[in-house]
């Protein structure tokens, strides 16, 4: 009987769903502007002249014009040391009177030395030009993302499932949020709501607010939440823990189905070779986008880093992918664990070379010209891309177009994390009290001063034990919470009320 059944169609519930149309995107009348040949020839002359002044002869020079940058490739004469040319970066920039140039010596796989010079009047790369391109329309990636145009004016498209996670960094106002919007927009143009869900985490509160209209189509959230876009830090921890739970559940289903990846699993499910009664279900990809990750680390620290590292390490096979953006690429935010698991990096302009090294493991991001100019690193090779520009009104039009259509009844529900998992690892069990507990309580009440060092001195015990005693006193309501370096408040004023409390605890 199973042979007669037709293939399962995940899109069946929303078979009437129409993808956003291309006319929702703004067309900028930059057109294919004619290449400014005079500027190009002038720059060629200046480069040759500058190098000649320092005694470096070159055999050939050719220019490739991109939307914001022109790349001049030179071949030096035999016997010229590359390091000599690399050291002349500032001199060449001076003679070209350019904002800042970048020398790539040598160009990987080309046998030339590249000099990147910003154009006098840069072109806008519109999202429309990238999404209407033949390459994007015809690509059959699992999660295709059209980022923008490379230096040769080709559209740059990558598959998020191959990445598998992406780290975005750059100083304020250099185009990070636009980059994230470009990623989300290109996914919305290619993926049906049944095939992809997104978890949007936005500590800035305003960046992703636009996407709340597509909640019932594309977003995933905790079951009892009102808002699908997560802005509250405590909720972020719950959501991330819930995602790790979803990841473990998915791995179990994969194990039962004897497959290795979500792709194989879904193919098997579509062919109706997995029984839904045994808990099998079609799995959509889940893309987690976090804007301003540094803010989360500063407020919640390890609690957030742990689940992120876990998801980053294991979740690629079950179709969960993360895109994390931060404007502070310092080492205490982008830690080693996170770096190891985010092989693909997008670097917008940063201020210092150290920041650039933190993101890309090499300098270069500090020499970009800003406004969507970025380096995309995947493994060892760096690609310079002009990020496609998405305007807020454009995103709004797209989300409204999707939001007006019939969606699912609710947003995709993530598994609930039970209360026991939320208990802090250092939680206090009052049945397992320290033998000195009652004496310490009397001491604190007599002195009316809740300080750990007082307990240490009087009972001559170590800091750790005194700290645990303090936690137990706090749990039983004798002292208040810690307030940095100030002593804790003592809630019980006299020994008589303390004895009553201790009797009730015994």
Spans of model-derived segments:
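Low-complexity, intrinsically disordered P/S/T-rich segments
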Residues: 1-165, 216, 356
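P-loop NTPase catalytic phosphate-binding loop
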Residues: 16-20, 107-112, 116, 134-260, ...
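A generic structural signal for well-ordered alpha-helical segments
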Residues: 51, 93-96, 315, 339, ...
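Charged, low-hydrophobicity low-complexity segments
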Residues: 1-60, 265-266, 276-278, 397-435, ...
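Conserved alpha/beta core segments of nucleic-acid transaction machinery
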Residues: 378-474, 478-506
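Short, intrinsically disordered, mixed-charge
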Residues: 49-53, 87-101, 185, 189, ...
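Glycine/charge-rich, flexible interdomain linkers and switch-proximal surface loops
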Residues: 62-72, 101-119, 257-273, 280-283, ...
